[in-house]
Amino acid sequence: MKRLITTWFITFCAACVAWADTYEMPGFTFSNIDGGEFNTDDWRGRPILVVNTASMCAFTPQYEGLQQLHDKYADHGLVVLAVPSDDFNQEKDNAVEVKEFCTVNYDITLPMTDITHVKRGAVHPFYEWMNRTHNWTPRWNFSKVLIGPRGQVLGTWGSMVRPTSQKIISPIQASLAM
């Protein structure tokens, strides 16, 4: 009996260690709007809020809430990643215009990608992965995905849910153990 319990305990511990080392999201690379790249592997162990954005949309004022989240939680580990996209025909013509618009109107300092396909055309691999593994595709601009510290999808929200909504803040705080 002692041997059975010991065997069970060792197996259980090994499974726990394997589970703890599992990271669900593959690494993705995004082009940085300022040049260079972002690699999501650099953010392992941190929650990442990924939001497809647009400069000429009724939801564009949500940039303010995204920046507030960045300002409040970045030092605790949260990454807020803005992913400008013209897939819904509401983005500026080029990355320089997007960056200028966001800086002038919203004083954006959070990480921002170059203009990226999220639903149509050459869809970015992150969004392909979300569609394939979680049956999720942005329905409109300012759709949000929260990736947890272990690469797990903690939640998805549409455009109507503001970044500062408790629906988003609660899982962010939980993932930061606040």
Give, region by region, the residue ranges found by the protein language model.
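Positively charged n-region of N-terminal signal peptides that target proteins for export
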Residues: 1-4
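Bacterial N-terminal signal peptides
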Residues: 7-15
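N-terminal "domain-start" segment that seeds a small globular fold
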Residues: 19-41
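Loop/turn elements at helix/coil->beta-strand transitions in domains of secreted/extracellular proteins
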Residues: 44-48, 74-79, 106-111, 141-142, ...
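Short pre-active-site segment immediately N-terminal to redox-active cysteine/selenocysteine motifs
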Residues: 46, 53-56, 84-87
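Structural microenvironment flanking redox-active thiols in thiol-disulfide oxidoreductases
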Residues: 59-123
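Thiol-/selenol-based redox modules, centered on thioredoxin-like
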Residues: 125-178
